[in-house]
Amino acid sequence: ESSFAEKTFAVFPTLVFGGNLGKKSKYPVSYLTSGLKEIGKWLWLARFLKLDSKFHFIHANDIAQICGFLIKNHKEEQYKGFRKFVLGQKFISIDDAIITLLKRHNMRRFFAIPLTKKILKILLRILPIQTTPWDSFSIKKYDFNHVPITNPETFKLKSYAKSLNDILRLSKLPSCNNN
């Protein structure tokens, strides 16, 4: 065992949000946060689909908070040795995310067609849609629910962005700042 083992930890962030879209910032905007600008173009269509696939997300501030805590407290007994942490908030379904976004954009859902894994695979075969290897992996995996999941509350800290509503508010996307 290496002398570095007790000081070593690995973090595996789930989907990372961070930065804001409303003004210039000294911090970069994450790929996912920058993608929030595109949601309005597709939300009208997404509201008619129901996807139960689950995922976790985490804000960059929460990642920094957890890493800072682990660096300062690596000598404590419960954190000794090489540790692995999957970082994220409690999972939400894609459908829950769509509903949250619809509320933020003052849109309604009248009905939704369940888009199962099987239907999704068929659509990808018959429609002229190109998928990347990551897209294909994600469709096969379908659910990205990790156990255990680590967030600031794991260490008795307070999350900067615990919910998707927090993410939308902090992103400073103009249509998403109506609490």
PLM region spans:
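Conserved beta-loop-beta element that borders a ligand/cofactor-binding pocket
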Residues: 1-23
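Short aromatic/basic micro-patch
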Residues: 10, 54-57, 91
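Short, functionally important structural connectors and interaction interfaces within domains
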Residues: 8, 47-50, 84
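Short, well-ordered coil/turn elements that cap or connect secondary structure elements
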Residues: 3-5, 52, 107
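Mid/C-terminal beta-alpha module of Rossmann-like enzyme folds, strongest
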Residues: 62-133, 151-179
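Low-complexity, charge- and small-residue-enriched intrinsically disordered regions
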Residues: 43-60, 125-148
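Acceptor/aglycone-binding surface of glycosyltransferases and processive sugar-polymer synthases
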Residues: 24-29
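A conserved pocket-lining segment of Rossmann-fold NAD(P)-dependent short-chain dehydrogenase/reductase
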Residues: 31-58, 66-69, 78
